[in-house]
Design a protein with these regions (language model features):
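Cyclophilin-like peptidyl-prolyl cis-trans isomerases
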Residues: 20-249
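Sec-dependent bacterial lipoprotein signal peptides
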Residues: 1-18
Length: 249
C-alpha cells in the first residue's frame, strides 16, 4: 500500500515538473517571438536612416554640380539664360536698423539677374555695409570674414559690362553697382557689391559711369540711419552693419 502511494506521488511530481518546464519554455518562446519584430523594425529603421543620409549626400553633391564657377567668358551667357527663368524683381535687405525693400529694374537684365542669383546663393548674408559716406552713399556686399571670401571663390571671379544707356539716373534711393578699380578702363561692374544713393536730390555726377539697376521702394529711413553711423578714416562703420538679403517676389 505504502509502495503504491509512493509511486503515485512520484508520478504526480514528474507530471507537474514537466508541465512547469513546458510553461517556462512557452514563455521564453513567446518573448523571443515578440522581440523579433521589434529588432527587425529597429534594423529597418537604421537601414532607412542610412539610405536617407546617403540620399541627402547625393542631393548635396547634385546641387553643387548644378552651379558652374563663373568667369569673364561664361558669366554673360549664363545670366542671359538665368534672367529668362528667374523673373523675381523685389528683394529685402534686413539689418539691425530695419528693412530696405528694393525693386530691381527689368531693363537692366544682367544686373538684375546677377543680384537675384547672388541672393539665392546666400552670398549677401552676413556681409556688411562696409563703406558709409555721410550725405552721399552707403555701400554693401563685402566683409573681411573668411566666409565671404570663400563664397566668392565658389561662385567665381567675373565682371559685368556697364549698362548706363537705359535712362536711369542716380536719384536719391537708387541702387547702383560700383566698378572694379583694378585695371578697368571700361568701368566694368564689380558684381558682389552695390551702393544706395542717400544724397538728396541725387548724385548725378555718377551718371554714365555706374549702372543703376533698382530703387528703394520702402525703408529709406533705414538708409538714412546707416548713413549716420560713425566711421573710421577708411569710411568703414566703427560697428559692423550686417545684412541678410531675401527674395520678396
Amino acid at each position: 500500500m505504502r509502495t503504491t502511494k509512493l509511486l503515485i506521488f512520484c508520478i504526480g511530481w514528474t507530471l507537474l515538473f514537466n508541465q512547469c518546464g513546458t510553461d517556462q519554455s512557452k514563455k521564453r518562446e513567446d518573448q523571443v517571438i515578440k522581440n523579433t519584430p521589434a529588432k527587425i523594425e529597429e534594423n529597418n529603421e537604421s537601414q532607412k536612416k542610412s539610405e536617407s543620409v546617403g540620399a541627402e549626400d547625393k542631393k548635396v553633391e547634385e546641387k553643387k554640380k548644378d552651379f558652374i564657377v563663373l568667369n569673364d567668358q561664361n558669366a554673360i551667357p549664363f545670366f542671359f539664360q538665368y534672367q529668362k527663368q528667374n523673373k523675381e524683381e523685389k528683394v529685402r535687405i534686413s539689418t539691425r536698423f530695419g528693412n530696405i525693400d528694393i525693386l530691381l529694374f527689368k531693363n537692366t537684365p544682367y544686373h538684375r539677374a546677377n543680384f537675384i542669383y547672388l541672393t539665392k546663393r546666400g552670398y549677401f548674408n552676413n556681409t556688411t555695409f562696409h563703406r558709409v559716406v555721410p550725405g552721399f552713399i552707403i555701400q554693401g556686399g563685402n566683409s573681411d570674414r573668411y566666409e565671404t571670401a570663400k563664397k566668392r571663390g565658389e561662385i567665381g571671379k567675373y565682371l559685368l559690362p556697364p549698362d548706363t544707356r537705359k535712362g536711369h539716373k542716380h536719384h536719391r534711393g537708387v541702387i547702383s553697382m560700383p566698378s572694379s578699380e583694378i585695371e578697368n578702363p571700361y568701368k566694368l561692374a564689380s558684381p558682389y557689391e552695390f551702393f544706395i544713393v542717400q544724397q538728396s536730390p541725387g548724385a548725378y555726377h555718377l551718371d554714365g559711369s555706374y549702372t543703376v539697376f533698382g530703387k528703394v521702394i520702402a525703408g529709406m529711413d533705414v538708409v538714412d540711419k546707416i548713413n549716420k553711423q560713425r566711421t573710421d578714416n577708411r569710411e568703414t562703420p566703427l560697428t559692423n552693419v550686417f545684412m541678410e538679403v531675401s527674395i520678396l517676389e
